């Protein structure tokens, strides 16, 4: 349904904010606690040509609302609970991606049904957004999501170690997806969040530790004997951001849970860590076996 033009300007002034708030409420409940709005133009100005998001010919065009979705360690309890109870997640080939995609679909539906932010540039109901998943690198879907996080004020992209560093969570974040609402105009410059400072730029000791850890991690690829510990070297790069010279065992307070770390770096552990973790989570599978056994009696 379209609104009268006399109401359109007033509605558009808060549309991006209302839509983002509705998405944030739904996504945070699923452990996706990083939800940041930005103007699509800001991203396209810094993105490599192959990773730019083409604006649509109608609607807000280059100034469309983009919403970056990510997570801190908060994702793990929500994900493991779903993996533990829901075969659609627990039996999926890529359960985290499946969980995130489902959470985003549900959040879009919730936001669309809410009163706030339901009107677009035409004065009509907003179409569903285009969704760009960070793991999809196919032509037309590739997004330089770390650069987007940088211009959206989410995390500082350190160009030397290639980590996105959040003010609260440090390097312990994951950037999952981007939603582009072509019918809603994104925030203007007055509402632009500043990029957080790089903590390594003002801490020479931390800079040195991270650079050394990064160089050591790269050396692991040239050293066959280091294959078993290669993933640990990359974890050490993240840990070096917050390393305390007085107590090297002290970890970042927002560091991932240990199983979350191992799951995240599974690609460098031969799949064993992820398989072990998933086997331990499938409580529903044991329940299903017991039920089937009871049915056979």
Regions found by a protein language model. Give the residues of each.
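Auxiliary alpha/beta "docking" domains used to position bulky ligands
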Residues: 8-297
């Amino acid at each position: 349904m379209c609104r009268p033009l006399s109401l359109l300007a007033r509605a558009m002034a808060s549309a991006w904010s209302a839509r983002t708030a509705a998405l944030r409420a739904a996504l945070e409940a699923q452990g996706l606690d990083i939800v940041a709005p930005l103007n699509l133009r800001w991203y396209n100005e810094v993105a490599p040509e192959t990773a730019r998001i083409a604006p649509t010919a109608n609607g807000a065009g280059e100034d469309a609302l983009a919403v970056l979705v990510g997570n801190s360690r908060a994702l793990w309890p929500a994900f493991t609970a779903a993996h533990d109870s829901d075969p659609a997640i627990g039996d999926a080939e890529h359960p985290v991606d499946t969980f995130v995609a489902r959470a985003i679909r549900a959040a879009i539906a919730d936001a669309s049904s809410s009163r706030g932010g339901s009107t677009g540039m035409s004065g009509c109901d907003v179409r569903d957004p285009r969704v760009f998943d960070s793991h999809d690198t196919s032509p037309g879907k590739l997004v330089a999501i770390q650069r987007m996080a940088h211009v959206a004020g989410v995390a500082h992209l350190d160009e030397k170690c290639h980590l996105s560093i959040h003010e609260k969570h440090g390097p312990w974040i994951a950037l999952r997806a981007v939603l582009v609402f072509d019918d809603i105009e994104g925030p203007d410059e007055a509402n632009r969040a500043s990029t957080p400072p790089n903590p390594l730029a003002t801490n020479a000791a931390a800079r040195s530790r991270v650079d050394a850890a990064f160089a050591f991690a790269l050396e692991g690829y040239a050293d066959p004997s280091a294959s078993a510990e290669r993933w640990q070297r990359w974890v050490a790069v993240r840990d070096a951001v917050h390393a305390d010279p007085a107590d090297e065992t002290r970890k970042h307070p927002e560091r991932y849970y240990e199983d979350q770390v191992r799951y995240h770096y599974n690609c460098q552990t031969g799949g064993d860590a992820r398989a072990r973790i998933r086997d331990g989570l499938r409580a529903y599978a044991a329940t299903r076996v017991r039920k089937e056994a009871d049915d056979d009696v």
